[in-house]
UniProtKB/Swiss-Prot annotation:
One of its GO terms (biological process) is cell division. InterPro entries: CDC123. The lineage of its organism: Eukaryota, Fungi, Dikarya, Ascomycota, Saccharomycotina. The gene is CDC123. GO terms for cellular component: cytoplasm. It comes from Candida glabrata (strain ATCC 2001 / BCRC 20586 / JCM 3761 / NBRC 0622 / NRRL Y-65 / CBS 138) (Yeast). This is Cell division cycle protein 123. One of its GO terms (molecular function) is ATP binding.
């Protein structure tokens, strides 16, 4: 097969492949290798609408303490009072979906899981809101309270993809296709060393290639290559291939020190929609994966200073001033307040135009 043909060759993906990569499908199969998690399923329709609505509306309750609403809730003399006190605005402003009013059971269930597990990191069926870490002061997906979960999910383009575009490239998607049953996954938080996470491309039941997951340079990784490959081979061949229904898939594995076990972080479809990282899909498609063939574990070999200067995921999703503000908790708090002001101003102007 010529390289020109391979570049144009299709890599079809089916609806069942997407379904098989949903967290709840594979979690029970590999539970002992996955960080402790809780799955809430099904989700109320109001919660899905809440994630899809414009803006971010956090629950306002005098009985719930929150870093993100406490100042507003405990004082009547704040920036929002001018809008809230306007009679015209009060009668015509539609507040949208609000957690405490529209899905209180789910709200309380999330709070209970945080009490049980401690800090958590959220995701929907397939994606975690890693592109929205700029909105939290800690610049991670670590959530200590329910409002942080709402902020991450509402600000993430990855979550929008899960809700609206997960099956877009499926060759067997038919007219009248019904939406999947969405799920909220809350995984117990633990700090992952990004240098030790790897993306593994499994083709026809064999490891075809492995890429460093974090695209920064770590000088100690190269001498550990054989150790990583031995652990990856054993885990994929003994645990994943016998239990996962698709023989071609992409999985993210974490191998922490002292390098004696493997954590399963995620499973993705063997599809061009999955980021090949240090490879190209042309390379992967043309690899002839055989039992006796040694594959490449590809690493960053030199220090990419430009990569260190930017935050992963965020540079393509939010303005630079927002990313810069995320480095300062006070600035991001001010930004959130200004955002709310602008939304209220927009609602007021719309109401005035309709009169």
């Amino acid at each position: 097969m010529s390289e020109e043909y391979a570049v144009l060759s299709e890599l079809p993906v089916t609806c069942s492949q997407i379904d098989n990569c949903a967290f709840s499908f594979w979690y029970e199969k590999f539970k002992k290798h996955v960080p402790k998690s809780r799955v809430i399923k099904p989700l109320p329709e109001q919660f899905i609408q809440y994630l899809e609505q414009d803006g971010i509306k956090l629950p306002m309750s005098s009985t719930e303490l929150s870093t993100y609403t406490d100042d507003v809730a405990r004082t009547e003399d704040n920036e929002y009072s001018d809008w809230e006190g306007d009679e015209d605005t009060a009668t015509e402003y539609e507040p949208g979906i609000e957690p405490l009013n529209d899905f209180p059971e789910l709200h309380n269930q999330i709070k209970e899981i945080i009490v049980e597990l401690g800090p958590v990191t959220p995701k929907l069926n397939w994606s975690a809101p890693k592109d929205a870490t700029w909105i939290l002061p800690n610049n991670t997906t670590k959530c200590n309270e329910v409002n942080e979960i709402y902020l991450l999910l509402n600000a993430s383009n990855y979550i929008v993809h899960d809700l609206n575009h997960a099956y877009d490239e499926c060759i067997d998607k038919k007219e009248g296709f019904s939406t999947p049953e969405y799920e909220l996954v809350l995984r117990q938080w633990f700090a992952i060393n990004p240098a030790l996470e790897f993306r593994v491309f499994v083709k026809d039941g064999k490891v075809a290639a492995v890429s460093q997951r974090d695209l920064n340079y770590y000088d100690y990784l190269d001498k550990l290559t054989d150790t990583f490959k031995d652990l990856i081979d054993e885990f994929v061949e003994d645990e994943m291939v016998p239990q996962f229904p698709d023989k071609s898939f992409v999985t993210d594995l974490y191998i922490p020190r002292p390098f004696n076990r493997v954590f399963l972080i995620d499973i993705n479809p063997f599809s061009r929609k999955t980021d090949p990282l240090l490879f190209t899909w042309n390379e992967i498609i043309n690899i002839n994966a055989q039992p006796d063939r040694d594959y490449e574990l590809r690493l960053i070999t030199e220090n990419n200073i430009g990569r260190f200067a930017s935050k992963e995921h965020s540079q393509n999703h939010v303005p630079k001033d927002v990313v810069d503000a995320s480095l300062d908790p006070e600035r991001i708090r001010e930004l959130s307040q200004k955002w709310s002001e602008l939304l209220l101003q927009q609602e007021k102007e719309s109401s005035d135009e309709e009169k």
